[in-house]
């Protein structure tokens, strides 16, 4: 859900940059060295998911997987997503350098919210209903939160002039809700079987 460069005015860009720096600082302070491989894994997944996208108005539609990453990384999604978004700007010109801070906040903030809402439910052995609840919840909050924040930023910056584009951006992400939720459930199931210790060690990222 990258917002394009040249859409937002300077005050919004500066506010996004300041908030992004604050989030990155918190994430780096809480990131432990033994968690770097997991952080890199989710950063790579976020990067790959965002490279397959369809431009829609002043944004784009693509898998986000931010809610899933937030479940396991907490505040560490800010530095993780920063690297992924920066590489997307450099190699594919997605978004832009000026809007990088805003895009980071749009993607990472819902991920942190998903972490606080669902991290306590993560267990190595989870019933199917719990995996569905956490996976779907993370997918909906991640994608829905990103869409809501992107819409809020656009309305704050452009008012009613962006109303139709905001509606288009939200409606076009309905399939992403479904796909992100399915993938999140699958990842939770897989990690519970192959890497169960990670399900018990989310506290340090909070």
Curated annotation (Swiss-Prot):
Taxonomic source organism: Haemophilus influenzae (strain ATCC 51907 / DSM 11121 / KW20 / Rd)
Tagged with keyword Transport: yes
Topological category with respect to the lipid bilayer: Multi-pass membrane protein
GO cellular component: plasma membrane
InterPro entries: CbiM/NikMN
Superkingdom assignment: Bacteria
Membership in a protein family: Belongs to the CbiM family.
GO biological process: transition metal ion transport
Sequence intervals crossing the membrane: 6-26, 38-58, 72-92, 94-114, 136-156, 165-185
A UniProt-annotated Pfam family: CbiM
Major subcellular site: membrane
Name of this chain's protein: Putative metal transport protein HI_1621
Database matches in NCBIfam families: PRK06265.1-4 (NF004904), PRK06265.1-5 (NF004905)
Subcellular location, record wording: Cell membrane
Annotated function: May be involved in metal transport.
């Amino acid at each position: 859900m990258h917002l394009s460069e040249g859409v937002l005015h300077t005050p919004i860009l500066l506010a996004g940059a300041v908030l992004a720096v604050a989030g990155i600082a918190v994430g780096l302070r809480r990131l432990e060295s033994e968690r770097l491989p997991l952080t890199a894994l989710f950063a790579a997944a976020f990067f790959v998911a965002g490279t397959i996208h369809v431009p829609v108005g002043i944004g784009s539609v693509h898998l986000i997987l931010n809610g899933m990453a937030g479940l396991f990384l907490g505040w560490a999604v800010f530095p993780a997503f920063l690297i992924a978004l920066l590489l997307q700007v450099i190699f594919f010109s997605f978004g832009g350098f000026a809007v990088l801070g805003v895009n980071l906040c749009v993607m990472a903030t819902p991920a942190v919210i998903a972490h606080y809402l669902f991290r306590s439910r993560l267990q190595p052995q989870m019933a199917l209903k719990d995996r569905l609840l956490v996976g779907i919840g993370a997918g909906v909050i991640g994608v829905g939160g990103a869409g809501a924040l992107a819409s809020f930023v656009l309305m704050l910056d452009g008012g009613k002039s962006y109303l139709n584009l905001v509606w288009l951006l939200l409606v076009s992400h309905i399939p992403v809700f479904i796909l992100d939720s399915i993938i999140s459930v699958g990842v939770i199931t897989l990690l519970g079987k192959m890497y169960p210790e990670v399900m018990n060690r989310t506290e340090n990222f909070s």
